[in-house]
Each structure stands twice: as structure tokens, then as C-alpha cells.
Amino acid sequence: MYAVIRTGGKQYKVSEGDFLKVEKLEGAVGDTVELKDVLMVGGETVAIGTPLVPSASVVGRIVDQGKDKKILVFKSKRRKNFRKMYGHRQPRTVLKIEKINA
């Protein structure tokens, strides 16, 4: 069984037992998170939502809270000797998908 969920403005295809790196979710390591934005559930039969599948949810456990790799941004203007480099590390959460409720 698999599901397509929406979190952090992105869509992910998940199955039970998968590890998923998503935008930061509130909660401590070990907490359970229920994601209710389920767009599609598949298996023997496929249920496609309009836009969400009613009464479907995905349960996951927070494995890690941390930061992603550094993203470098470089700006320059030609012929003006203007160069600027900066970056940031986006906060992220790692989830382990435990159960898909369809």
C-alpha cells in the first residue's frame, strides 16, 4: 500500500517503513505526527482525492530534527566588480512512516 501526501508545499509518495525528509514539522524526536493531507491512496484499489481523500491519514514518527545541506547563493553584476555570496541551511525533519490509514 502506498499514499501520496502533501506537506511543506511539496508532494511525496510514501509506503509503510519509508524514511522521508520534509520541511520542518513541530515536535520532538520520538513524537508521532499524523498527516491528513492525503491526495491519493493506492494498493489493490486506488482512491484519488478531489483534492483530498476523506478519512485517510498517514502516521509517522519523528526520527530527527536538524538542518539540511547549506545552499549557497552567489550574486554578481558584470563589469562593476560587485560580488556577493551568502547561504543558509533550511531546517528539516526526518519521518519514518509507520501506518497508512485508508
From Swiss-Prot:
Transmembrane segments: none annotated. Pfam families: Ribosomal_L21p. GO terms for molecular function: rRNA binding; structural constituent of ribosome. GO terms for cellular component: cytoplasm; ribonucleoprotein complex; ribosome. PROSITE patterns: RIBOSOMAL_L21. Keywords: Ribonucleoprotein, Ribosomal protein, RNA-binding, rRNA-binding. One of its GO terms (biological process) is translation. InterPro entries: bL21-like, bL21-like_sf, Ribosomal_bL21, Ribosomal_bL21_CS. The keyword Phosphoprotein does not apply. It comes from the Bacteria. NCBIfam families: L21. Part of the 50S ribosomal subunit. Contacts protein L20. This protein binds to 23S rRNA in the presence of protein L20. Belongs to the bacterial ribosomal protein bL21 family. This is Large ribosomal subunit protein bL21. It comes from Geobacter sulfurreducens (strain ATCC 51573 / DSM 12127 / PCA). The lineage of its organism: Bacteria, Pseudomonadati, Thermodesulfobacteriota, Desulfuromonadia, Geobacterales.
